Amino acid sequence: MEFTAQQIADFLHGSVEGNPKVRLHDFAKIEEGRSGCLSFLANAKYEHYLYQTQSDAVLVNQDFEPRESVKTTLIRVPNAYAALAQLMQLVDSMKPQRKGVDSTAFVHPSVILPDDCYVGAFAYVSEGASLGTGCSLYPHVYVGSGVSVGEGTILYPHVTVYDGCSIGSRCVIHSGAVIGADGFGFAPNAEGYSKIPQLGNVIIEDDVEIGANTCIDRAVMDSTIIHRGVKLDNLVQIAHNCSVGSHTVFAAQVGMAGSSHVGEWCQFGGQVGLSGHIKVGDRVSLGGQTGLLSNVKSGSTLLGSPGMPLRDMLRASVIFPKLPDMSLRIEQLEKEISELKEICKNNKH
């Protein structure tokens, strides 16, 4: 598959600065550019690579002004990173789509399979499940009873979807993810712990992507809900009765305790932890390893554990390394004050 720089610019509503006829057939990082490749520059930290890259063309922002002469062809677009995503989606859509049911797969007779659906080797589709047009179930996927899988959704190898759960259209769920396992619900008693049956389900709305080995637990009752457009990295844990608002993104190892709720357009760094029964507003940003113990207002940016406003945390981080010396100084001052008090007391007599 090959395109000229001009064809790419036309598709992206951009403009060419250089050779519009240069032919491109692959992508490469700007620092590892090769002949015939397209790279991109969206971060100023990588600008110096532009002047030495071997890539034949580079996507840049419309307002980019080079500080040195550029030998490669530039394709100017409003947003280089977004344009790269758009272009790579186009290329990905041109790949041949798998279709048909492998002879080793099991599909219950009650399931109506669309003609263009793919069910891979040793996949298992249970009674009453519903599969949308163009969905793909890779080898060893398990789809439980009454599960609904939307149009164009992809379940990669070893994904497990428990009974009664719903997955929307155009979702991508990566290998090893478990949707709808029992929530961590136990009632303590004199003899130990009694299991609380988890009778709800999980609802995943359209255009959600879920990383490898992520677990989303079914609700005690009602539903655990992942709203439209959410993106979850690998190894994320979402407990029973939680909800994640539309277009929120979680980096790896985020953990939500039960019945916590996150708003729309939030961004959580890696290893963020939420205690149970709290609410996080819309457009909240949490730095890596932030721990939340209480509700958070919309628009907040927090860091640390427990989470505190970013500016306060940055100030505190300057002080933390000095605490041992400060403690010694305080002890010395307390000793001197005590001695002064004793002197004053003796002088009175």
UniProtKB/Swiss-Prot annotation:
Keywords: Acyltransferase, Lipid A biosynthesis, Lipid biosynthesis, Lipid metabolism, Repeat, Transferase. InterPro entries: Hexapep, LpxD, Trimer_LpxA-like_sf, UDP_GlcNAc_AcTrfase_non-rep. Pfam families: Hexapep, LpxD. Its EC number is 2.3.1.191. GO terms for biological process: lipid A biosynthetic process. Homotrimer. Belongs to the transferase hexapeptide repeat family. LpxD subfamily. This is UDP-3-O-acylglucosamine N-acyltransferase. It comes from Porphyromonas gingivalis (strain ATCC 33277 / DSM 20709 / CIP 103683 / JCM 12257 / NCTC 11834 / 2561).
